[in-house]
A protein has these predicted regions:
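Glycine-enriched alpha-helix->loop->beta-strand junction motifs that scaffold or abut catalytic
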Residues: 22-25, 45-50, 88-89
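Internal helix-turn-beta structural module
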Residues: 67-93
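Conserved, mostly hydrophobic/aromatic
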Residues: 19, 42, 84
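Active-site/ligand-binding-proximal alpha/beta "capping" segment
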Residues: 7-28, 98-107
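Alpha-helix-loop-beta-strand connector modules within alpha/beta enzyme cores
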Residues: 35-63, 109-110
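Conserved small/polar residues in nucleotide/adenosyl-binding loops
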Residues: 1-5
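Generic hydrophobic/aromatic pocket-lining and core-packing "Φ" positions
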Residues: 13-16, 39, 81
Length: 110
């Protein structure tokens, strides 16, 4: 099941609960950063893992802002992951997977 473009929280929650009742073994919420409230609510309401996907547009925004010197790309990349997990995601999918794994291996992110 995937919650996306759900501008109505109640409708998104209803979809998630229905999908779990129908046998879904995971709930995917995307885009990650825009829907952290849904990640939090869904993770509290279902008994299956909640995954979130940081979509290509989020990746492109961070890359572009870093290229302009407006942000620290690594810091933002790490904060995005921490935010997803803090919201309740058990799985975080990102285009930054390799870079994020390196930061975790080096102890720069828990």
């Amino acid at each position: 099941m995937c919650i996306r473009d759900s501008h109505n929280r109640r409708e998104g929650m209803k979809e998630a609960l229905t999908d779990v009742e129908e046998g879904a073994d995971i709930i995917m919420v995307k885009p990650a950063m825009s829907y952290l409230d849904m990640v939090s609510e869904v993770s509290k309401a279902v008994n299956v893992p909640v995954a979130t996907y940081s979509v290509s547009g989020e990746y492109a925004m961070v890359k572009a802002a870093a290229k302009m010197g407006w942000i620290d790309e690594e810091r933002i990349m790490c904060e995005m992951a921490v935010s997803a997990y803090r919201a309740g995601a058990q799985i975080y999918l990102t285009y930054y997977a390799k870079e994020l794994a390196k930061c975790m291996d080096e102890g720069r992110i828990g």
